[in-house]
């Protein structure tokens, strides 16, 4: 009550932010007459004037009124479009490191030109991030004339582009690209073998379009670059034959049904578990197939990989459904993005799941992959000095944006009042009754000439609705992952009178639905249209536009509620743009996934009490409230999963930053001999310590063992026993010095053969190669540690603390291995002439190229994170030599991860 009263008096934080920004809007409007008087050349010259002022020390923020006024005037001249005041507000919000919530049709693309221009003035680059390649290309080409008029260069970063083209795109003032491509380029840059191979500049300002889709929906799926591992396709086929013999346990919560099934399915957690009965049966079947020996247990240490195959096959059969989670096209299993309904060509599930699905579908099984590099979007986007984003629906996720990314959400008012009618949900007992009611609604609406957009949550559901519409003789378009090539075209014409369009989820997001259809699309379809043709097309469009307005605008039908209220709001947001009329309604049934998992018993109980008859719908505040509560439950569970994933990845992120910092320093120097000399001392000291313990008696020394180790690992023949016999005065310290001196002498002789310059080049190559190889093994070890760490909870230990402690110990061990491997490799390589070093270098490059060609870029299905709590810090701060090491060891950076730098 008190908070409401205070808000009434002082306004909400959102109101106060907008009030402050409106003062700047008044300033920009006051400058408009002055800007209109400038010639084109004078307006263009403003860019260089602003750049000069920034160089002299003026802040970018102080230029906001003038810079925004310049962009608005340039837009009027280039596009004939003037930024509305609310778009200026949106631009300021985006410059203020905030999320701007702007409704569909409010011109987010034009709004983005303001902060993009302003932040590009510093010369550090601006990355505009979109959800797909089509939108990146479209927005870049649409805005290019405006930016080029103002003297700014525009680049487009697309998958599959050669490195020089990518480098050019990143060197531009403003670069457009997808979130995946920016992330993969970052990972690839940190796998480069020379500074010239890197394409990105320092990450300065990211402006993320559809920010909720990228930073929230996709936050659980890390970006992974992986290379091929060993072939195990036969094992997937053998295990796949066994799974159909298992029966699913129907009531997993009931003790009375415990013995009936062979495996239980937890739909919420997306997990499958064998029951006792299932374990006995599967062990029998594995023995029959000759995969496992009689008397062996599936859970014995030697069968860990087999257990991995069984679990993957069970998940593939029980949790992943064709045409919902994936489609099969041209003998290939292609993932369908659960949030957008689009296919994700080239993406693969990890942990053997993709291979298990391929075995289930009987298509060719491709090799499993080994992770070479990975990062989550959460950690990638926090590397930018400055981050902002825009979307039509962010307010429901404001807490998450604030807690994880330190981004506040500001709701920008609409240019015209919203007049769309959002009708209450209708709930039916069965799916069939619901579909029938939807068909009747569509018939009624289209009879009046009203266009209808039907939103479904999967390809399968869109095809069910499509079949029923075909039976009813209603013409319609289907927009799903199977037919996404003509996506923008179908969406653009979805506003035609009486048009019916079925779209999965948010397919077609980013393209406006114009009432009466898009006259621009009709003009674009003509070859060299005349003025008369264009005028006729516009006149015809105006008639259609008025007819659709009279019929009530675009009607949205949701065929079921999504897990997230935000995605339901996005579907509704396709209607009612720029003050247009419109309406929306969701149709639900007790058989929908959300209702079945979260709201089923209570709501069906209510419906029975209310005496529901077949075909009747319920429209009641209780039901709506129960559904909203179910969605809130799912949202909070998904938020916890994302938060836990981030807290886990933060541990790996500290290590990743330390490794990538060292790797980049290594790439940028040509001479690493000082580092080699320093680690040689460490390595030989540790090696000698193992056989001659410090301050020990001579009787405790293992001289034969030391001689053998030096020979095997460093190719050094040293008659240490002879030295000790001939020189009694030789004590522990002088012996250590002699061994090190001898090793340096042998190495210097090698250097004389090939020359110092070639040796420096070779040393750097060996260090990079060894670092990459060990980092790859370390990532695999971290994956294994992560998968089982939750079991520590049963021993009353905090899994997150255990993960931190063990991963740090593994990281420290990896750094020690790195030193040892580098010195061992450099000592053992027999070089007789410079050409041999060149040949080795060539071989290394060919191997790197081969790996690059075989790399898979994938989204990992990662819903099994365990809780952790680390503070999120935005931006990549350079670690000082005397700062505490980011790994949490308590040591200084220079004495820990920084020792190689």
From Swiss-Prot:
It holds the Pfam family SecA_PP_bind. It comes from the Bacteria. Keywords: ATP-binding, Cell inner membrane, Cell membrane, Cytoplasm, Membrane, Metal-binding, Nucleotide-binding, Protein transport, Translocase, Translocation, Transport, Zinc. Its EC number is 7.4.2.8. Its cofactor is Zn(2+). It catalyses: ATP + H2O + cellular proteinSide 1 = ADP + phosphate + cellular proteinSide 2. One of its GO terms (molecular function) is protein-exporting ATPase activity. It is an enzyme of class 7 (translocase). GO terms for cellular component: cell envelope Sec protein transport complex; cytoplasm; plasma membrane. Coiled coil: none annotated. May bind 1 zinc ion per subunit. ATP binds at residues 87, 105-109, 512. It is found in: Cell inner membrane; Cytoplasm. It is a peripheral membrane protein. Zn(2+) binds at residues 885, 887, 896-897. Induction: Repressed under conditions of excess protein secretion capacity and derepressed when protein secretion becomes limiting. This is regulated by SecM. SUPFAM superfamilies: Helical scaffold and wing domains of SecA (SSF81886), P-loop containing nucleoside triphosphate hydrolases (SSF52540), Pre-protein crosslinking domain of SecA (SSF81767). GO terms for biological process: intracellular protein transmembrane transport; protein import; protein targeting; protein transport by the Sec complex. HAMAP family: SecA (MF_01382). Monomer and homodimer. Part of the essential Sec protein translocation apparatus which comprises SecA, SecYEG and auxiliary proteins SecDF-YajC and YidC. Part of the Sec protein translocase complex. Interacts with the SecYEG preprotein conducting channel. Has a central role in coupling the hydrolysis of ATP to the transfer of proteins into and across the cell membrane, serving both as a receptor for the preprotein-SecB complex and as an ATP-driven molecular motor driving the stepwise translocation of polypeptide chains across the membrane. Belongs to the SecA family. This is Protein translocase subunit SecA. It comes from Salmonella typhimurium (strain LT2 / SGSC1412 / ATCC 700720). The gene is secA.
